Curated annotation (Swiss-Prot):
A lipid is attached at C20 (N-palmitoyl cysteine). It catalyses: L-threonyl-[protein] + FAD = FMN-L-threonyl-[protein] + AMP + H(+). Belongs to the ApbE family. It comes from Chlamydia trachomatis serovar D (strain ATCC VR-885 / DSM 19411 / UW-3/Cx). SUPFAM superfamilies: ApbE-like. Its EC number is 2.7.1.180. InterPro entries: ApbE (IPR024932), ApbE-like_sf (IPR003374). Flavin transferase that catalyzes the transfer of the FMN moiety of FAD and its covalent binding to the hydroxyl group of a threonine residue in a target flavoprotein such as NqrB and NqrC, two subunits of the NQR complex. The gene is apbE. Its cofactor is Mg(2+). GO terms for molecular function: metal ion binding; transferase activity. This is FAD:protein FMN transferase. It is a lipid-anchor. The keyword Disulfide bond does not apply.
Length: 316
């Protein structure tokens, strides 16, 4: 089983109010691809429905692992990344549809969400973990082998063509949110009130068993957020850092420069975005972490009519 690179995740937690007499509900919990998940149905499922629900959840996770997981060498996306040919590559319907969504995310984000930075990110991580910096020649080579414009999708043939042999796709910036969307669809077969969380990305439907909305906590705001038929995704810069030559680098690449954001000049700590689509919220939270200031990020979010919460180093 593969695992996901957990750099953009892990800052949301379910906020369940306790009472002396807990309402009836059904909870499924486990760990998939090294990341814990929690699913709460707003009613008690029958034993048969419980077993069927678990099978559906497992089916979704297997699908994500086999198709979209960059850390699974046997996944469809990993096979595509190993290909250096610049000829059309047939895609499964699921992966093609997801890449079409990503095409929209990239355009909406003004290029700040760019999943083609995979090879460039791998280059930097390899060097940063050794406390070194890639040479200017390598940076130039990999930077010019990155960019969504180097991916060509043929909607008629449902194929992908690389316009550079080095370009690779890193889906980690949105695939957890996408998985949560699929898990929500699976849960809807059994109950119209549910809460789905996987590694910090959350999707809700209907109401909590107590009759209130679902409540969650986020590191991007001190508020308790109440969700109804919406999802929330969070990205942050505080989880991975490396010290090289008196500088501290984060794991987040600036899509404009192709270099990791420096901790000293990057005040944003965490971003949460609320949307009906968890995949979209995940992508936009990732994009918002690349801005140089909280105010600049908030201005852009307002311009795009995004519901975003942002915390920075200046928080009291």
């Amino acid at each position: 089983m593969g695992k996901f690179f957990a750099s953009y995740l892990l800052i949301l937690a379910p906020f369940f109010l306790q009472s002396c007499s807990a309402p009836s509900r059904t909870t499924l919990e486990g760990v998939r691809m090294t990341i814990p998940y929690r699913i709460v149905f707003g009613e008690a499922l029958s034993p048969d429905a419980f077993q069927q629900a678990q099978k559906e959840i497992d089916r979704v996770f297997d699908h994500i692992d086999q198709t979209f997981n960059n850390w699974n060498p046997l996944s469809e996306i990993s096979r595509i990344n190993r290909t250096t040919k610049q000829t059309p590559i047939p895609l499964s319907p699921a992966l093609f549809a997801f890449l079409c969504e990503i095409d929209h995310f990239h355009a909406f984000s003004d290029g700040r969400f760019d999943p083609t930075l995979g090879a460039l990110k791998s280059l930097w991580l390899l060097h940063l973990k050794s406390h070194t910096i890639p040479s200017q020649e390598l940076q130039h080579l990999y930077k010019h082998s990155s960019g969504w414009h180097l991916i060509s999708l043929d909607k008629t043939q449902q194929t992908l063509r690389k316009l550079s042999p080095l370009v690779q796709l890193d889906l980690c910036g949105t695939v957890k949110g996408f998985a949560v969307d699929l898990l929500g669809t699976a849960c809807a077969q059994f109950c119209q009130n549910y809460y789905v969380e996987w590694g910090g990305e959350i999707k809700t439907k209907g109401k909590h068993p107590s009759g209130r909305s679902w409540a969650v906590a986020s590191s991007a705001t001190p508020e308790i957020l109440h969700l109804h038929d919406h999802a929330i995704a969070t990205s942050g810069s505080q989880y991975q850092r490396w010290h090289v030559d008196n500088k501290t680098y984060t794991h987040i690449l600036d899509p404009l420069t192709g270099t990791p954001l420096e901790d000293s000049s990057h005040p944003i700590l965490a971003v949460s975005v609320i949307n009906e689509s968890c995949a979209f919220a995940d992508a936009m939270a990732t994009a918002l972490t690349t801005f140089s200031s909280k105010q600049e990020a908030l201005d852009w979010a307002n311009k795009k009519h995004l519901c975003a919460y942002i915390t920075d180093k200046n928080v009291s």
